[in-house]
């Protein structure tokens, strides 16, 4: 399971022109689910994402988590993250989880986040338009 996290001052996701999820200060989480992923990996990744220190303290050091700053999380499914890009000019998607399992684990991950922080989400498998203001920019690739 892969989470590409971005520290944002705001982010939103739209489907067919309608905002389906939006946050102010917090993390945009692009989530990729791989074939071998399970609930244990999702839980570990939620713990890392919500505790990862990406926000600045009073001295300007990244010592605070999204929980520490009272931020929110916007979780968006991103099936391209597990893609194999090592050869050629076209990505291979065989490492990604089957759609039904990916959706189940995406929902599980999002639900766990919502138990910890205000959480918004995109719509699984929809054609989404994501807008954000990346604060920094600060972006990290986390895996479970």
Curated annotation (Swiss-Prot):
Coiled coil: none annotated. Belongs to the DTD family. An aminoacyl-tRNA editing enzyme that deacylates mischarged D-aminoacyl-tRNAs. Also deacylates mischarged glycyl-tRNA(Ala), protecting cells against glycine mischarging by AlaRS. Acts via tRNA-based rather than protein-based catalysis; rejects L-amino acids rather than detecting D-amino acids in the active site. By recycling D-aminoacyl-tRNA to D-amino acids and free tRNA molecules, this enzyme counteracts the toxicity associated with the formation of D-aminoacyl-tRNA entities in vivo and helps enforce protein L-homochirality. It catalyses: glycyl-tRNA(Ala) + H2O = tRNA(Ala) + glycine + H(+); a D-aminoacyl-tRNA + H2O = a tRNA + a D-alpha-amino acid + H(+). Keywords: Cytoplasm, Hydrolase, RNA-binding, tRNA-binding. GO terms for cellular component: cytoplasm. InterPro entries: Daa-tRNA_deacyls_DTD, DTD-like_sf. It is found in: Cytoplasm. GO terms for biological process: D-amino acid catabolic process; tRNA metabolic process. The lineage of its organism: Bacteria, Pseudomonadati, Pseudomonadota, Gammaproteobacteria, Vibrionales. One of its GO terms (molecular function) is Gly-tRNA(Ala) deacylase activity. A motif (Gly-cisPro motif, important for rejection of L-amino acids) lies at residues 136-137. A Gly-cisPro motif from one monomer fits into the active site of the other monomer to allow specific chiral rejection of L-amino acids. It comes from the Bacteria. This is D-aminoacyl-tRNA deacylase. It is an enzyme of class 3 (hydrolase). The keyword Aminoacyl-tRNA synthetase does not apply. The gene is dtd. Homodimer. Its EC number is 3.1.1.96.
């Amino acid at each position: 399971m892969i989470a590409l996290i971005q520290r944002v001052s705001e982010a939103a996701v739209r489907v067919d022109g309608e905002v389906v999820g939006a946050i102010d200060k917090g993390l945009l989480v692009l989530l990729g689910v791989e074939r071998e992923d399970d609930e244990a990996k999702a839980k570990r990744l939620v713990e890392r994402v919500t505790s990862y220190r990406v926000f600045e303290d009073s001295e300007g050091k990244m010592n605070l988590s999204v929980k520490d700053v009272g931020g929110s999380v916007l979780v968006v499914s991103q099936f391209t993250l597990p893609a194999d890009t090592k050869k050629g000019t076209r990505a291979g998607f065989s490492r990604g989880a089957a759609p039904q399992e990916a959706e189940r684990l995406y929902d599980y991950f999002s639900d766990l986040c919502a138990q910890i922080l205000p959480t918004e989400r995109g719509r699984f498998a929809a054609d989404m338009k994501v807008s954000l203001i990346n604060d920094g920019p600060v972006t990290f690739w986390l895996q479970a």
